[in-house]
Design a protein with these regions (language model features):
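Eukaryotic scaffold repeat domains enriched in small/polar residues
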Residues: 1-179
């Protein structure tokens, strides 16, 4: 603990997982669960979420892309939040499919809060006139990706988007995933 800056410096043993280390490649997000006593680190470069013991900071497990995960999203966890029973809510870098929700065991549950793509009236008009071949050549309209995620005390999931053209920048999702 640094009494001047009021920060707690944590030393994490690096190295391979087989040797008991935590091979961080480029961590971007962190979340601590007091309820579960675990520290979660989102590392898009390693394409994993590392779960550490909250007291010893020893690696407990790592979670890669779940085998049952649907969609095209490359599993590059960028931001992370964890609820009281251990469900993980992960913002995946460059994902347009929503927030990835994992079960406490690391299995894929669903995409939460799919953001809707913005198409202006002119684009909509031209798409309606285009042939199938022309539509293939047009740029796809992707939903804005989320930039952060957190939970409130009632279990609602909050997310933000950095899309400057979007009217909605902060989202609050209920258990069904509705804003």
């Amino acid at each position: 603990f640094d009494s001047e800056t009021f920060t707690h410096v944590v030393t994490i043993q690096s190295g391979s997982e087989e040797a008991g280390g935590c091979p961080l490649a480029g961590p971007k997000g962190v979340c601590f669960s007091e309820t579960l006593g675990e520290l979660y680190i989102a590392d898009p470069a390693a394409q994993k979420v590392f779960v550490l013991d909250g007291e010893t900071y020893a690696l407990k497990r790592s979670l890669g892309r779940p085998e049952n995960m649907t969609g095209d999203t490359q599993f590059a966890p960028y931001r992370i939040a964890v609820d009281t029973i251990g469900r993980l809510y992960i913002v995946v870098q460059n994902s347009h499919e929503g927030i990835v929700e994992l079960n406490p065991d690391g299995g894929f549950s669903r995409y939460l809060g799919l953001n809707k793509p913005k198409i202006n009236l002119i684009e909509y008009f031209w798409r309606s006139l285009a042939t199938d071949e022309q539509k293939k050549q047009m740029a796809k309209a992707y939903a804005p990706s989320f930039g952060g995620v957190d939970l409130d005390g009632d279990g609602f999931v909050f997310a933000v988007t950095g899309d400057t053209s979007s009217e909605e920048k902060v989202f609050r999702f209920n258990a069904k995933g509705d804003n």
